[in-house]
From Swiss-Prot:
GO terms for molecular function: ribulose-bisphosphate carboxylase activity. It comes from Bradyrhizobium diazoefficiens (strain JCM 10833 / BCRC 13528 / IAM 13628 / NBRC 14792 / USDA 110). Keywords: Calvin cycle, Carbon dioxide fixation. RuBisCO catalyzes two reactions: the carboxylation of D-ribulose 1,5-bisphosphate, the primary event in carbon dioxide fixation, as well as the oxidative fragmentation of the pentose substrate. Both reactions occur simultaneously and in competition at the same active site. Although the small subunit is not catalytic it is essential for maximal activity. This is Ribulose bisphosphate carboxylase small subunit.
Length: 134
């Protein structure tokens, strides 16, 4: 199951050239770029591990791409994403976030719906082991 999180998630995975162009777009807007990774891609897990510090004041996406290559070397078996943070007054939030690396076998989730007291509905997400393709 292909995980769909962030921008471009329903498109084919981005190439390094496409990632470079997206990062350059973020830098041209003056956004801080950061790289994060996780082995738990659950949608409610918003706190991924940061790879280094956010990259402020960069002018060229090559610096981000060098850090991405190193992150992939160390954590290539995990999900890696790039985010662009806009610190402009009135925004002050992540403006773009997209996956740039996936593990060889992706996890699957199952949503369990349960009716509880007062006809309230409770949802539980169960993470299943990745399906192995032979």
């Amino acid at each position: 199951m292909k995980l769909t999180q962030g921008c471009f998630s329903f498109l084919p995975d981005l190439t390094d050239d496409q990632i470079y162009k997206q990062v350059q777009y973020c830098l041209a807007k003056g956004w801080a770029v950061n790289i994060e990774f996780t082995d738990d891609p659950h949608p409610r897990n918003t706190y991924w591990e940061m790879w280094g510090l956010p990259m402020f004041d960069l002018q060229d996406a090559a610096g981000v791409m060098m850090e991405l290559a190193e992150c992939r070397r160390v954590y290539g078996d995990r999900y890696i994403r790039i985010s662009g943070f806009d610190s402009s007054p009135g925004w002050e939030s992540v403006r773009i976030s997209f996956l740039v690396n996936r593990p060889p076998q992706e996890a699957e989730f199952e949503l369990v719906r349960q009716e509880v007291g007062g006809r309230a509905i409770r949802y539980t997400t169960v993470r299943k082991a990745p399906a192995h393709v032979s």
